Amino acid sequence: MNRSLLFITAVMMLSSCAGPRAASQKTTAEGILNRTGKSVEPDTASTNSSLPPGMDLRQPLSPDDAVEIAIWKNPQLRADLATIGLAEADLIDAGLLRNPRLDMLIPVGAKPFELLLSFPVEVFWQRPRRIAASQQALDQLAQSLIQNGINTERDARWAHADVVQALDRAAVAKQSAELRERVSKLTEVRLRAGDISELETIAAKTESASAGEQLIRFEHDVQLATERLRAVLGVASERPSLRVNSSPPPAEAPSPMEALLEKAMERRPDLRAAELAIATATKRAGWERSRVLLLSAQLSSKEVGTNGVLTGPGVSFELPVFNRNQGLVARADAEVEVASRQYVALKQRIAFEVAEAREQLVQELDALKTVREQVLPPLQRAVALAEDQYKKGDVAYLFVLEQNRGLIDSQLRVVDSEAAIRRAHAQLERSVGSRY
């Protein structure tokens, strides 16, 4: 009896000592910091509305400022990080032991007293596999959350670029409106002098009104882009006036495709998560196979006539005749195959994302260079000459209007190309998994 009690006690102590390793929210936040260079707000922060140290929403925000605030405060990222607590709870549950079972039969009439203590022995081969599967799932989730942090960085840079683009488009539209207003006034002067017909004056007024309407739309676009930036930063409920710094977009050409793809395969957290998904499914398949046999050690005490209470060991197990856990084993094997195929699909998607982002960046860099060096200078010269000739009465208003329209369209192309470069640069960083 003493040996049996000692055996069961030793099993319980040894099983409870093998604690799992947990990847906490703190370590996941450190992973985001390593990839983005920005910190997640610690759980010890005083209020949820705090900003990163040194940040002030009343000051103009650079793209890096926007990323720092978004990583710190973005509510969806913080909600995603909170889910790691669920995986940690699953890991804790995987390490718990099934409680011993005590059956006691009360002596009634001629029936003797009987006591039966059962302890699940299958813990020796099931618990390590269960813990390993839960640990892999936790690590997989941690890598996925690091990828969410990288996505948040990309979204912040996109939102910042949208605000800069909206502001620049509004500035170009303002110049266009002022120019058309000036031309409209010139036509009125020439009409009074009898140099042109009233029809040209009406056309000039119409163009001036259209330019004013376009300016109003672009100014509303500024407000819409600012609200999107607020949402990404996590300050949608706070109403300070947001301002942004409009710095030139990166002008350097990206690295060769082979180098970017190699770095992406090495650095992408979601690819690492896909690898861990295969390991998780494999561990789970091993765990499901270990559940075929359920074995319990028993300690039985029974009153036997005049001999008093006799105690002795025993075993109890299920006979795997009908149910050998075939369904869950087959499901676990299928999960391994699914995870493997998803891993291959993700590698293909990463290769496409890197190639697409790089090609977009190169395309917009080339387009911006062409417009700036070959399109804008002659248009600016043509507009200046056309306005001078119109004042002298040598050309018609429509000629001036066409020259100005071409210049405004080219200036908008510059603004759009600069914004596209900022977005493509952010997307390429996200596709690679870090700064490239």
Segments predicted by a language model, with ranges:
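Short segments within alpha-helical structural elements
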Residues: 181, 210-237, 342, 347, ...
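Outer-membrane beta-barrel proteins
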Residues: 128, 198, 308-310, 324-326, ...
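Short, charged, amphipathic alpha-helical segments
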Residues: 81, 135, 198-206, 397-405
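Terminal intrinsically disordered/low-complexity segments used for targeting and assembly
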Residues: 1-72, 219-263, 429-436
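Amphipathic alpha-helical coiled-coil scaffold segments and their short linker/junction regions
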Residues: 56, 63-71, 133, 196, ...
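Periplasmic alpha-helical coiled-coil/stalk elements that build and connect Gram-negative outer-membrane
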Residues: 143, 147-263, 357-360, 364, ...
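A small-residue-enriched
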Residues: 18-36, 68-123, 226-235, 261-327, ...
